[in-house]
From Swiss-Prot:
It comes from Saccharomyces cerevisiae (strain ATCC 204508 / S288c). The keyword Transport applies. It is found in: Endoplasmic reticulum membrane. This is Phosphatidylinositol 4,5-bisphosphate 5-phosphatase INP54. Gene3D superfamilies: Endonuclease/exonuclease/phosphatase.
Length: 384
């Protein structure tokens, strides 16, 4: 086990409101081991983080108890997949679930090597809503914990936010995404979380390419990718802003893969041109004062195998070695702007969540037809 670095794998995946439970093992294996060719020796990580958006229909996100079985099944499947890999190579199970947190249809799952690592019990879990009227339609879910290696006492804090920001193209929607990011960071981060030794912000951030779509674009060309990413990609342009750069204190490894959205369902490489192909799915991490860090990670889209074709998004994985903390306090390096919220926003959001949930349930069960039919029958009887 490397004593100087943490080995971490982070994957984000928008499931498109539909997670086929019957195929959960194939899906989870692809997300955990995106670079496993079945031949080379696979290096297992200290931590595995799986971030999901739209893992269930949006209305179903209003009922956490209903979603618990699905989340538990995904978590158990992930643990079993990891321990099967361990058994095949080392013959000894060593992975378990460190924690799970959810907000609506957004979920984050953290798995760790419990034979080599220890975690303090005070795991923080927080949520920040930024959907319409403060609902869970959009938002972020945080899990934050302190961890060290067995035999060591230098605890380091890891924090992960899995987010789903405002969708669609255009300046107004871009500005709403900026507000969503600020609101989530403001709601879930206090000074302790902001000082985390290791901090990741991941998910379907929904930032778009602003250039007009050209059907002849060659996304396999590195020159084309560089031109789009440097000149027309919203998040990159916002992060380079001179006056108020977005995501200050975070950085991102160089993107070398084609856009991850929007694909035609059940097709591996064909984009749905109702939307401009964009890099919506991203993984940012806290900036380090270690110049070689960028050379110690891989940042790729996960191949769209048959198991993943049910979504119009392509998952993204970041596998990195993180530098160990020196143990000395560090100043706040993440810019967190206090987002103004009214005293009633929480209550309005709760009411909105309930309305979304029950209205969605009524439509799904076709109850609205029964209500409409009963109303028409009542009016007919009154007339007669």
């Amino acid at each position: 086990m490397n004593k100087t670095n943490w080995k971490v794998s982070v994957t984000t995946f928008n499931c498109g409101k539909e997670f086929p439970v019957e195929n959960s093992k194939a899906i989870v294996k692809q997300l955990l081991f995106p670079y496993d060719d079945g031949i080379s020796q696979l290096e297992l990580q200290d931590l595995y983080v799986l971030g999901f958006q739209e893992v269930v229909p949006i209305w179903q996100g209003s009922f956490p108890a209903v979603n618990r079985d699905l989340i538990d099944r995904i978590t158990t499947t992930a643990v079993n997949c990891l321990n099967e890999k361990v058994s095949a190579t080392q013959g000894d199970e060593q992975y378990s679930c460190l924690g799970v947190n959810s907000l609506g249809a957004i979920t984050i799952i953290v798995l760790y090597n419990n034979n080599a690592l220890k975690v303090k019990d005070d795991i923080l879990k927080r949520n920040g809503k930024c959907g319409w009227f403060g609902t869970h339609l959009k938002g972020g879910t945080l899990i934050s914990f302190q961890m060290t290696r067995n035999g060591e006492e230098n605890w380091e804090r890891f924090s992960y936010i899995c987010a789903h920001l405002n969708a669609n193209e255009g300046v107004n929607n871009r500005n709403q995404r900026i507000d969503d990011y600020k609101r989530i960071m403001s709601e879930v981060c206090d000074s302790e979380v902001a000082k985390s030794d290791h901090f990741f912000f991941l998910g379907d951030l929904n930032f778009r390419v602003t250039s007009t779509y050209d059907p002849t674009t060659n996304y396999s060309s590195t020159t084309t990718l560089r031109r789009l990413l440097e000149n027309h990609e919203e998040l990159n342009l916002l992060r380079k802003g001179e006056d108020e750069p977005l995501c200050k204190g975070f950085q991102e490894l160089k993107i070398t893969f084609p856009p991850t959205y929007k694909f035609k369902l059940f097709e591996k490489e064909t984009y749905n041109t109702k939307r401009i192909p964009s890099w919506c799915d991203r993984i940012l991490y806290k900036s380090y004062a270690v110049p070689t860090f960028a050379q110690e990670g891989t940042y790729h889209s996960v191949p769209r195998s048959n198991a993943l074709l049910f979504s119009d998004h392509q998952p993204v994985n970041l596998t990195v070695r993180l530098p160990r903390s020196t143990g000395t306090p560090v100043p706040l390096s993440l810019h967190i702007e206090k987002y103004p919220l009214s005293w009633s926003s929480g209550l309005i959001g709760q009411i909105g969540d309930a309305v979304i949930g029950y209205c969605g349930w009524l439509v799904t069960k076709n109850v609205h037809y029964w209500i409409l039919g009963s109303l028409l029958l009542y009016l007919l009887l009154k007339i007669l």
